[in-house]
Amino acid sequence: MSTLLSFGEVLIDLLPVGHSGLVHEPIPGGAPANVAVGYAKLGGKSHFAGGISADHYGVMLQDALAAQGVDVSCLTVVPDAATATVLVSLDAQGERSFSFNRQNTADMLYREADFDAIDWSQIDIFHLCSNTFTEKAIFTASLYGAKKAHKEQTLVSFDVNLRLSLWQDTRLLSARVEQCFGYTHLLKMSKEEALYLALERGGSFDDYLAFCIAQGVRLILVTNGAESVLCHSAEFSFELPVPKIVAIDTTAAGDSFVAGFLFELGRDEGYFTPGPLVQKLLNRVNVQTAAEFAIKCGAITCTTKGAFPALPVLAQVQS
């Protein structure tokens, strides 16, 4: 089984309680934290790296990660910074909208030296998102981590995961996201995100997929809500159906999909070293197997409110 290091923000999702929208419950979340927990709950060896506060919420988050089986030894505690929070609203279909409180919070203060302290020989997969690209210092650190992982022959997984409200200047967004492509083996985007980035470059959806591959991306996974998932590489391109479900909360569905794909991809113990794991992305059968597993994970997650509690265990996916 491959070992995952997921990097980025771990924060508090303030989820609505009842129908008034006035009462909210603090729930652990953050896209890369969800991926780390999802991977661990399926049975994988999972680490999480990022900045975390010493405040009440920070302690709660660290305990929550550890309780789900995530190794938290790569966390950097930032004593004088607060924990980021996000106010989550859900519509009738379970789709989300977000309002972030993330000014100088602990998750924004992870630096290059923190990556240097990690024993990369123990890591097979490095995962990150673009939510740590919004300000220059944390973007520089994030890109440094991706470069370091790539140099160490670690599979680099990048979920674009755009949250436009986090960006003070969205003109910087596409350039920063695209700088990461040269160090990315596996790229995950929603169809909406891909169309946004394609428009920024003045091209079509298909043009943008070709651009990503030309930058060195080995495999692109494009999700589209209840529609089919696209698996695209230089060698193949195909779509897989998504099961029809009644969605209660889609908060961590994409993260569950990523965790499931990475887990299934690296599941054969004693066989895959970092090099062959990257090469496995080029095999259509392997990709289809992992993507079908990932789709089940995402669908199950939509049927429960919250993030960590909604992420499935292996028995749920196999049943």
Spell out what each predicted region is.
Residues 23-30, 56, 171, 203, ...:
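Residues at secondary-structure transition points
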